[in-house]
């Protein structure tokens, strides 16, 4: 845990400069994480019942976790929950109000699982969506394309995305999430 925190602090120190606005901090963190993290398709396949698509021995599933911030100490391969957990830790360290949220998204090509994790950030008093997973192009250039960065919760790109209300505190959920985006 302590080692992970050191890595988080270093990411923030390298990406965030004094005097940056919260929006600039979010952009810098998104770029830094897109530059250093890779989507762990093997973990995704092994943990979503598609082990036949994985390029590893299913008995090695323990090596392919990808779900938490401590993956920064391994090979920087994560799935959506890892991206979101790491972004949350970095945003907190940078002084940006953020939330880790889960829910469902429309089915994606090659996927039989529509569960997903992403973040909300408070920028200029408004809670915006940041999805580092979908913002990381993973096309070999390790760059963020910015398409899922600080989106309004009603942005058409987010149509079909539903928040898991059970994972948010009822007493504060209305402070963060557009009610039309909550699961019944």
Predicted regions, residues:
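Hydrophobic (often cysteine-bearing) scaffold residues that line and stabilize catalytic clefts
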Residues: 4, 25, 79, 83, ...
């Amino acid at each position: 845990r302590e080692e992970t925190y050191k890595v988080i602090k270093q990411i923030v120190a390298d990406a965030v400069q004094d005097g940056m606005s919260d929006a600039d901090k979010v952009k810098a963190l998104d770029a830094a994480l897109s530059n250093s993290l890779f989507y762990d398709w093997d973990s995704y396949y092994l943990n979503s019942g598609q082990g036949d698509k994985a390029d590893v021995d299913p008995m090695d599933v323990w090596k392919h976790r990808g779900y938490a911030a401590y993956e920064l100490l391994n090979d920087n391969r994560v799935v959506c929950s890892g991206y979101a957990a790491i972004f949350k830790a970095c945003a907190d360290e940078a002084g940006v109000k953020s939330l880790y949220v889960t829910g469902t998204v429309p089915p994606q090509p090659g996927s039989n699982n529509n569960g997903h994790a992403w973040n909300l950030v408070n920028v200029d008093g408004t809670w915006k969506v940041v999805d580092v997973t979908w913002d990381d192009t993973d096309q070999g250039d390790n760059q963020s394309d910015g398409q899922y960065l600080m989106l309004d919760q009603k942005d058409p790109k987010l149509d079909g995305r539903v928040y898991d209300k059970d994972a948010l505190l009822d007493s504060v959920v209305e402070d963060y999430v557009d009610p039309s985006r909550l699961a019944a």
